[in-house]
C-alpha cells in the first residue's frame, strides 16, 4: 500500500478521533413528586413559561470524556481518555418551532452556593423570551451533591466519577498571595466537564429523534457564564471541539466578568498572573467579554486588545452584580432542600447586611448592556455584522495602584456609556462596605438638589436629555431598540410628556 495513502488514513483517523460525539440523552419526566431543581415556576421570581409560549424539559446527558493536561505553552494532551460521566441539562425553548429564533444559549450554571443558579438567565431571560431563543442550563460538578440532596432518586445517575481517584493533588497557588493547599484526593473529576460541554452542544445541534432540540432548526449555539471555566474552554478545548459537520461545537461566546482561565482538571494548575494561558485567545468564532466597572481593576492582568473575533466591553457605572442575577435562584424551599440552608430573604438573598444597610440594586445598567451584547454576538455570527468596538474605562494616571478615573460626579470615564452616567442624577458606587458579597454590590448616592438644578432646568429638560442619549446608544448598538423604548416609556410615566 502506498505510504502516502497510509499516512493520509492515519491523519483521517486522528481527525475522526477529535470529532465531538453526540452523547446519549434521556428525558426526565415531571410528576407530582419529581421535578427539576431550578424549574422556572420554582425560582425566586417564578415564571409561568406556558403563558409565554415556552416549554421546559430536563435531560440527563451521558457519555465519555477525556481528562486533559494543559501545558504553559498552550499544548493540550489527553491524560485519561474516555472516562464515563452523566450530567443534567435544563432546556427552555418556544413550544412552537415557528417562533424559535434559531439561537440557543448554553449557560454553565453558577455553583457558588453548591446548587445550580442560572445567573446569566437572570439578566438575559426576558430578552431571550422576546427574541424566541432557547436557553440551556448545564450543571457544574460542584452542584452535583446539591442535586442529589434535592431529589436522590431523580438525580441518582448523575456522576463525574474520578477515573483516577487515588491521585493526590498538590495544588500550587499560582495566583499568589495565599498558601498552597494540602495534598488531597477527590471522588469527582472536574476536568470531565470540558468534553461534556462540547457534547452538550453536539446534542443541541442533533436532529435525531429524542434530541433536546429535535424538530427545531438550530442555527447557532452560544456559551455564556462568568469567570474562568469559559476562558479555559475557549483557549484549550474550543480548537479541538469540532462536530462531525466540520463546524465548531460552539458558534460564539458571551463572557461575564472575564477573568484568568481556570484549571483544566483537579490536579491541574490554575494559570496565574503573567501566564500566557490566562487571557482569552483568538479562536475562529466571535467572543464578547463583558466587564463591569467594578470588575475592571481586578481584571487588568488578563485584559487584551480587541481583534477580528474579540471584543471587550467595559460598562461604566456598573457593579459586579445586582438583583437581576438573583431572580433565577431556586426558591427558598428548594435551596434548603439542596444545601440545607438559604441566605436572607428574596429582597436580600444574603446572610449578612452591608454597613450601612443598602437595598439590592435594581439598576438595569448591566441587564440592558448584556441584552445588546447578545444581539451584537448573534448578528456577528449569523449575519456577519461585526460587533462594534468600545472605548475602555479610563485608568487614573500616576496612581500608585490601578484606579478608575472618575468624572466630576464620581462616575467612571470611558467604557460603554449609558444615560445614568451620561445624564447623571447620582454617583454610582460599584462596591459597598460590609461583609461577604457587599464588596461586589453597588449603591447610589443621589446628587443634591442644587447640583441637579444646575444641570437640568426642569424635569422635562432632564427627560429630553435622557431620551437623546438613549437614541444615540440604540443607534450605536449599546442598547436594544426594545430596551430603549422601555427607558423612554418609564421617563414619560415619571415625568409626563
Could you tell me what each predicted segment is?
Residues 1-8:
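Bacterial N-terminal signal peptides that target proteins for export
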Residues 8-9, 398:
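Compositionally biased, intrinsically disordered low-complexity segments
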Residues 9-18:
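Hydrophobic h-region of N-terminal signal peptides that target proteins for export
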Residues 18-497:
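C-terminal His-loop and adjacent cap/lid subdomain of alpha/beta-hydrolase
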Amino acid at each position: 500500500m502506498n505510504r502516502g495513502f497510509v499516512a493520509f488514513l492515519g491523519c483521517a483517523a486522528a481527525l475522526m478521533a477529535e470529532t465531538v460525539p453526540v452523547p446519549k440523552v434521556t428525558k426526565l419526566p415531571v410528576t407530582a413528586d419529581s421535578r427539576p431543581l431550578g424549574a422556572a415556576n420554582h425560582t425566586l421570581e417564578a415564571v409561568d413559561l406556558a403563558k409565554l409560549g415556552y416549554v421546559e424539559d430536563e435531560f440527563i446527558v451521558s457519555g465519555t470524556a477525556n481528562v486533559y493536561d494543559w501545558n504553559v505553552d498552550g499544548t493540550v494532551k489527553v491524560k485519561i481518555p474516555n472516562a464515563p460521566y452523566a450530567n443534567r441539562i435544563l432546556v427552555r425553548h418556544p413550544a412552537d418551532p415557528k417562533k424559535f429564533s434559531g439561537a440557543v444559549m448554553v449557560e454553565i450554571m453558577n455553583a457558588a452556593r453548591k446548587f445550580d443558579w442560572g445567573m446569566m438567565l437572570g439578566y438575559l431571560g426576558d430578552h431571550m423570551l422576546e427574541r424566541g431563543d432557547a436557553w440551556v442550563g448545564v450543571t457544574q460538578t460542584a452542584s452535583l451533591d446539591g442535586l442529589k440532596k434535592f431529589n436522590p432518586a431523580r438525580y441518582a445517575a448523575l456522576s463525574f466519577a474520578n477515573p483516577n481517584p487515588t491521585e493526590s493533588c498538590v495544588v500550587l497557588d499560582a495566583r499568589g498571595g495565599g498558601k498552597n493547599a494540602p495534598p488531597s484526593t477527590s471522588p469527582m473529576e472536574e476536568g470531565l466537564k470540558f468534553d461534556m460541554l462540547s457534547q452538550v452542544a453536539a446534542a443541541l445541534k442533533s436532529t435525531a429523534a429524542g434530541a433536546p432540540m429535535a424538530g427545531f432548526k438550530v442555527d447557532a449555539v452560544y456559551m455564556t457564564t462568568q469567570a474562568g471555566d469559559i476562558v479555559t474552554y475557549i483557549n484549550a478545548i474550543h480548537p479541538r471541539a469540532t462536530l462531525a459537520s466540520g463546524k465548531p461545537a460552539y458558534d460564539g461566546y458571551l463572557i461575564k466578568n472575564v477573568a484568568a482561565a481556570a484549571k483544566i482538571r483537579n490536579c491541574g494548575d490554575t494559570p496565574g498572573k503573567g501566564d500566557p494561558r490566562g487571557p482569552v485567545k483568538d479562536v475562529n468564532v466571535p467572543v464578547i467579554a463583558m466587564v463591569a466597572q467594578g470588575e475592571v481593576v481586578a481584571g487588568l492582568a488578563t485584559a487584551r486588545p480587541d481583534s477580528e473575533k474579540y471584543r471587550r466591553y467595559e460598562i461604566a457605572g456598573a457593579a459586579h452584580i445586582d438583583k437581576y442575577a438573583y431572580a433565577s435562584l431556586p426558591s427558598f424551599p428548594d435551596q434548603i432542600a439542596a444545601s440545607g440552608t438559604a441566605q436572607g430573604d428574596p429582597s436580600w438573598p444574603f446572610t449578612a447586611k452591608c454597613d450601612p444597610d443598602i437595598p439590592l440594586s435594581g439598576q438595569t445598567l448591566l441587564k440592558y448592556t448584556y441584552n445588546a451584547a447578545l444581539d451584537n454576538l448573534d448578528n456577528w455570527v449569523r449575519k456577519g455584522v461585526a460587533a462594534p468596538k468600545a472605548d475602555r474605562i479610563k485608568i487614573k494616571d500616576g496612581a500608585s495602584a490601578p484606579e478608575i478615573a472618575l468624572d466630576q460626579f464620581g462616575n467612571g470615564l470611558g467604557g460603554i456609556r449609558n444615560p445614568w452616567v451620561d445624564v447623571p442624577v447620582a454617583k454610582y458606587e460599584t462596591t459597598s462596605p460590609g461583609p461577604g458579597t457587599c464588596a461586589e454590590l453597588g449603591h447610589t448616592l443621589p446628587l443634591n438638589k442644587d447640583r441637579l438644578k444646575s444641570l437640568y432646568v426642569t424635569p422635562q429638560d432632564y427627560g429630553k436629555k435622557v431620551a437623546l442619549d438613549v437614541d444615540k446608544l440604540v443607534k450605536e448598538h449599546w442598547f436594544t431598540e426594545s430596551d430603549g423604548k422601555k427607558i423612554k416609556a418609564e421617563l414619560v410615566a415619571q415625568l409626563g410628556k
